[in-house]
């Protein structure tokens, strides 16, 4: 009798604590004893102020550079877990996918010597075919200019240090690998909904071998919780929840309202992009679930984890040339990287990876390997996403998170690496994915502040920032 009563008391306390997380005075987040805790926005060390005042503008400036804009990816890999015909549930979430539209300089090496006239003819034909297909709301842009092709041919390089991978690694020279300009394909609403994304997220949460109840059911997917887990299991859960939540924030921040049906298919009015505060409040508030604010905390947790990975990789990044063939821009990129690292170094409250995978060596190694292998599977699940743009960003973000985990955990004492193995190697694609992933979480935290101002006027941390990014209106012009 005492045990159920104790559990009820603990649950009640949890609900009370969580319900205070969105009350005035506790709207921001700070580094806590283990991870992230709600705190007063007036505190100087809030993660919100770090990001919105000091980090956000610098990382966005960096991601506009050629070295970081282009990501090499195979968008045609088969889903390894179930049959997938890549047909979206609506005609709004599909996008045009035309391999031959990719410029000759970025195709596989045996196609580079094709005659320019033939290539141009193929590209024109494919572009015409693509014009009538795919996502009507936000199609994926695969175009590259000639000077961009030449730079990318020179800037792509890779290494052999892939033994400790935390995500599915694609061979840069394999068939199907093509460059995508991420600046032309921002993460936002695409209309992708229904059974397909539900199946993907169900599989991702099922891949979480650390869930409290070994028998997975829909209640865990609806209201997942890390209550009762050890540190490593809580970290794994937070990675999944934080990824899910960051994607939801992007969709809510860049949501789409279609034109009135009365206009018909010949109507000239376009739909409206807007910030969907109601969607944000429903997902991250406490109206429907006490778990809402916890989901936000997991976004901040991944932000701190990737911030720590960037700090740990700082010596490597400082020696990187970030070569694109444009000497002026390459120098600007190196300066932008150093400016970002300087801000990261100044922050005192970083994630501490040394607390993980400790104890008996054999158990720690087994737990670390289980952690690694299950995260690899999550990265593979991204090939099962039917919406191309959603799949692209799913692959980028899991690749970036996997790179962060590789940096943080590959040189721990119980790793299969030697104790003094501090000179890890990264591919160009890993560096791009890590910064792009960090950029997504940085943007999410800024958007949280925009939503915070909508829901609690005057509580935004940006109200006190004279040099921060301008606040967005509820209606978004793209």
UniProtKB/Swiss-Prot annotation:
Which stretch is the leader sequence?
1-20
Q: Where does FAD bind?
A: 188, 190, 201, 241, 244, 283, 295
Gene Ontology terms, MF aspect = FAD binding; protein-disulfide reductase activity; thiol oxidase activity
Residues carrying a glycan: 377
Which topology term describes how it sits in the membrane? Answer: Peripheral membrane protein
- GO cellular component terms listed in the entry, alphabetical order: endoplasmic reticulum membrane
Q: Fetch the InterPro entries from UniProt.
A: Ero1 (IPR007266), ERO1-like_sf (IPR037192)
- Is the keyword Signal in the record? yes
Highest taxon, organism lineage: Eukaryota
Give the UniProt keywords, A-Z: Disulfide bond, Electron transport, Endoplasmic reticulum, FAD, Flavoprotein, Glycoprotein, Membrane, Oxidoreductase, Redox-active center, Signal, Transport
Query: Disulfide bonds, which pairs?
Result: 28-41, 30-39, 79-384, 88-93, 209-230, 387-390
Q: Does the keyword Nucleus apply?
A: no
Localization per record: Endoplasmic reticulum membrane
Region Disordered: start-end pairs = 117-143, 459-478
Which co-factors does it depend on?
FAD
The Enzyme Commission number assigned here is: 1.8.4.-
Q: Which GO terms describe its biological process?
A: IRE1-mediated unfolded protein response; protein folding in endoplasmic reticulum; response to endoplasmic reticulum stress
Instruction: Summarize the protein's role.
Output: Oxidoreductase involved in disulfide bond formation in the endoplasmic reticulum. Efficiently reoxidizes pdi-1, the enzyme catalyzing protein disulfide formation, in order to allow pdi-1 to sustain additional rounds of disulfide formation. Following pdi reoxidation, passes its electrons to molecular oxygen via FAD, leading to the production of reactive oxygen species (ROS) in the cell.
Record note on quaternary structure: May function both as a monomer and a homodimer.
The family line of this record is:
Belongs to the EROs family.
Q: Which PANTHER family match?
A: ERO1-LIKE PROTEIN, ERO1-RELATED
Q: What is this protein called?
A: Endoplasmic reticulum oxidoreductin-1
- Look up and give the organism this protein is from: Caenorhabditis elegans
Q: Its gene?
A: ero-1
């Amino acid at each position: 009798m005492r045990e159920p009563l104790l559990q009820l008391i603990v649950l009640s306390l949890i609900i009370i604590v969580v319900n205070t997380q969105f009350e005035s005075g506790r709207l921001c987040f700070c580094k806590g004893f283990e991870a992230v805790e709600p705190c007063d926005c007036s505190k100087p060390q809030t993660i919100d102020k770090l990001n919105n005042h000091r980090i956000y503008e610098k990382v966005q400036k960096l991601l506009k550079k050629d070295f970081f804009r282009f990501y090499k990816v195979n968008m045609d890999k088969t889903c390894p877990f179930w049959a997938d015909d890549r047909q979206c549930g609506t005609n709004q979430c599909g996008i045009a996918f035309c391999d031959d539209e990719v410029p000759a300089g970025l195709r596989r090496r045996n196609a580079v010597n094709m005659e320019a006239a033939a290539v141009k003819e193929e590209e024109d034909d494919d572009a015409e075919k693509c014009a009538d297909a795919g996502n009507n709301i936000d199609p994926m842009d695969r175009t590259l200019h000639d000077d961009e092709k030449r730079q990318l041919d020179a800037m792509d390089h890779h290494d052999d240090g892939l033994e400790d991978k935390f995500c599915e690694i694609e061979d840069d020279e394999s068939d199907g690998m093509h460059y995508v300009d991420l600046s032309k394909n921002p993460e936002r609403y695409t209309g992708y909904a229904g059974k397909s994304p539900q199946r993907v997220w169900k599989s991702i949460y099922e891949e979480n071998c650390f869930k409290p109840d070994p028998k997975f059911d829909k209640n865990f997917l609806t209201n997942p919780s890390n209550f009762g887990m050890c540190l490593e299991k809580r970290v794994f859960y937070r990675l999944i929840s934080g990824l899910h939540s960051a994607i939801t924030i992007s969709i809510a921040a860049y949501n789409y309202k279609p034109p009135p049906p009365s206009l018909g298919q010949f109507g000239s009015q376009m739909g409206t992009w807007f910030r969907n505060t109601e969607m944000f409040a429903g997902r991250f508030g406490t109206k429907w679930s006490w778990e809402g604010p916890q989901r936000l905390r997991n976004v901040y947790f991944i932000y701190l984890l990737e911030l720590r990975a960037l700090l740990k990789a700082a010596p490597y990044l400082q020696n990187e040339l970030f070569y694109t063939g444009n000497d002026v821009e390459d120098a600007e990129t190196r300066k932008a990287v150093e400016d970002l690292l300087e801000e990261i170094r100044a922050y005192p409250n970083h994630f501490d990876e040394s607390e993980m995978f400790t104890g008996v060596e054999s158990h720690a190694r087994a737990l670390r390997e289980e952690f690694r292998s299950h995260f690899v599977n999550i990265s593979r699940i991204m090939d099962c996403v039917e919406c191309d743009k959603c799949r692209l960003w799913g692959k980028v973000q899991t690749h970036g998170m996997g790179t962060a985990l590789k940096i943080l955990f590959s040189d721990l004492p119980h790793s299969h690496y030697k104790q003094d193995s501090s000179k890890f190697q990264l591919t160009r694609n890993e560096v791009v994915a890590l910064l792009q992933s960090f950029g997504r979480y940085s943007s999410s935290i800024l958007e949280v502040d925009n939503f915070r101002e909508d829901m609690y006027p005057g509580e935004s941390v940006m109200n006190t920032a004279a040099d921060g990014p301008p606040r967005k209106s509820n209606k978004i012009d793209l």
